[in-house]
From Swiss-Prot:
Binds together with bS18 to 16S ribosomal RNA. The keyword Repeat does not apply. It comes from the Bacteria. It holds the Pfam family Ribosomal_S6. PANTHER family: MITOCHONDRIAL 28S RIBOSOMAL PROTEIN S6, SMALL RIBOSOMAL SUBUNIT PROTEIN BS6M. SUPFAM superfamilies: Ribosomal protein S6. GO terms for biological process: translation. Keywords: Ribonucleoprotein, Ribosomal protein, RNA-binding, rRNA-binding. This is Small ribosomal subunit protein bS6. InterPro entries: Ribosomal_bS6, Ribosomal_bS6_sf, Ribosomal_S6_plastid/chlpt, Transl_elong_EF1B/ribsomal_bS6. Belongs to the bacterial ribosomal protein bS6 family.
Length: 98
């Protein structure tokens, strides 16, 4: 089976303190690794202002992960967990070209 490259962008609530934000990012990086993904890059884009209000917030901390996976298990598990997690305002997954 061919390896697919994915990019996940997610927005963390701005009122999360640095220690909890770091733990959250490490947790989601681990979710990818535990489900067969290989992390290429995980970087913080910092706090940015939104064009419109999301859940009563006007800004959020953006984080981007790039990883490869043989199947969609890592993407599906990340998606499932990020929908449950109250600290994540939005997330988007994109399948990248080779």
């Amino acid at each position: 089976m061919a390896t697919t490259k994915y990019e996940v962008t997610y927005i963390i609530k701005p009122d999360i303190d640095e220690d909890n934000k770091k733990a959250l990012v490490e947790n989601y990086d681990k979710v990818i690794a535990d489900n067969g993904g290989t992390m290429v890059e995980s970087k913080d884009w910092g706090k940015r202002r939104f064009a419109y209000e999301i859940d009563k917030y006007r800004e959020g901390t953006y984080h981007i992960m790039t990883f490869t996976a043989d199947n969609a298990d890592a993407v599906n598990e990340f998606s499932r967990l990020s929908k449950i997690d109250n600290a994540i305002l939005r997330s988007m997954t994109v399948k990248l070209d080779k």
